[in-house]
Regions:
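N-terminally biased helix-coil "hinge/interface" segments that flank
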Residues: 1-320
Length: 320
């Protein structure tokens, strides 16, 4: 049997005859599995993977369906499928600093990177030696701890692979097209630093965190005081982004498109108000923001972050 895009089952024979019915079958299968494991009839389900987070609503024990059918590349297929919100946020989201005036802002994704801890497990000494060399340099650069790689090749430090302006432009184009892959610090590395994940090379994650921690703002001050503080900053950013994303998807599923759009655009004043409410900040005017259903967290990083995400959204976490 094969799961259809709407969460129902179909035979293998029918799937071969009408493969279009399997659009979004993977996420739909996750939702059906979540419903089976949790026995919940109503829930918001968020599945955090390496590249993306998929969010959908369970009602009556089944996934809520999209009224307009699945969309592929902006085109309506008219095929019944799960009403799902997908955002570029996951365990492999690229974490880096962005200069904002004289300060630094931590960005997560939407670009994906191979985590440093995993790259060191795969390729060994070349990764560790390059990270240590960058840490030994007197001055930090934004490219410290960033590598690029082609399929089947050992990653090279970004600065070594981009010797001149023309080569740099070519490498950046190759990263966008997928011909090359970025290796850099990610939330997966942060969880290794904090001892909440142990699948791969913790030393590489620690070195990457140290390189990010010593990046300088416009006043010449280090971004944070230690690798552990940097890792906690990244984990906190993942929690906040996940909470905002889940709440936005819940609003969208309920038809509250203006509220969903406000959360998707940080420059909208309402976004700031909701963020303050989610953070529990005191103010003269109080706004409560959260979920009316339990939050089911799926994916490798769910156990490390979704307890705090649910707390932020004033709901119960369920981690099957």
């Amino acid at each position: 049997m094969v799961v259809r895009g709407d969460g129902a089952l179909m035979s293998e024979r029918l799937a071969r005859t009408r493969p279009i019915e399997t659009i979004l079958s993977g996420p739909a299968a996750s939702l059906v599995g979540a419903a089976t494991l949790t026995k919940l009839h109503e829930a918001v389900v968020s599945d955090i993977g390496g590249t993306t987070t998929d969010i959908a609503v369970l009602e009556g024990g089944r996934p809520r369906l999209s009224p307009s059918g699945a969309r592929v590349g902006g085109h309506r297929t008219l095929v019944e499928a799960v009403d799902m919100e997908t955002v570029g946020l996951g365990g492999d989201s690229w974490a880096r600093w962005r200069r904002d005036g004289t300060g630094l802002v931590l960005d997560l994704g939407p670009e994906r990177a191979l985590p440093l801890c995993r790259a060191a497990t795969m390729f060994g000494a070349p990764i560790l030696d390059a990270l240590k060399a960058s840490l030994a340099a007197l001055r930090p650069t934004p490219e410290d701890g960033v590598f690029v790689m082609e399929a089947g090749e050992t990653p090279k430090p970004f600065t070594d692979a981009t010797g001149d302006r023309r080569t740099r432009a070519a490498v950046l184009r190759a990263l966008v097209s997928g011909q090359m892959r970025r290796v850099a610090f990610t939330p997966t590395d942060a969880l290794h630093v904090l001892g909440q994940h142990s699948a791969w090379h913790r030393e590489a994650a620690m070195l990457g965190a140290a390189l990010l921690a010593r990046q300088r703002d416009g006043h010449g001050q280090a971004a944070v005081g230690s690798p552990e503080a940097l890792a906690e900053r990244v984990r906190t950013a993942l929690v906040e982004r996940s909470a905002t994303t889940v709440l936005s998807a819940a609003f969208a599923a309920d038809g509250a498109t203006e509220a969903a759009a406000a959360l998707a655009h940080p420059d909208v004043p309402f976004h700031t108000t909701l963020r303050a409410a989610m953070a529990g900040q005191r103010a003269a005017g109080v706004l409560t923001a959260g979920l009316g259903y339990p939050l089911v967290g799926l994916g490798a990083a769910a156990g490390a972050v979704y307890g705090d995400v649910a707390k932020t959204l004033n709901t119960e976490p369920v981690l099957p």
